[in-house]
């Protein structure tokens, strides 16, 4: 089905949860007609404000486990010409479907641990944000501190990069030929080899910068969105205020080739 739009879906907020929650859906690009749906986690009813002792009338009786798809699926073309559609869950599962065979499941493997409450927690594993596709491998950031490379055809892990200080690589990675960029919740931007996961360089963004528009700026935590590569430069926003690993910030940084 090459005339389709694919997207991930979140938790249900009331029970019973529909079969279209916590999964991936395909719709016709012209009509919006549902073509197929795959549910990764059943009966996952969750509301972010219902985790404490004080609950409102709108809170579901069973809250969680919040293991939905918190990121966009990835579409890859394999060397043999076949296509695979991959998704990652907050439970740490990576799954692949055949988008040209009604979403038939090809594999499902756990690569990143995972724990309940993946929306608001870092450190317990799981795939919270998006991934990237390189020349040979696909990549996901691990909520438990790491960057995972795996074969998109089989789901078999190739290598894992874990920073020395065990910070969480919470942002979506960005892949270009030979290099993967990954942002960490402590404000460090890493560049690692796409082949073997060895660190090429890193940069601490939690510092004060002189900006081109004259406004004082300070970097902070990097999470959610990843780097953008364009015109031979790498751009990254730093200052994700929800994470406690580094203070909030307000700066957009651009890196060039020396």
Give residue spans per PLM region.
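Generic short beta-strand segments
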Residues: 8-11
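Extracytoplasmic/lumenal domain signature
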Residues: 1-3, 14-69, 74-170, 174-258
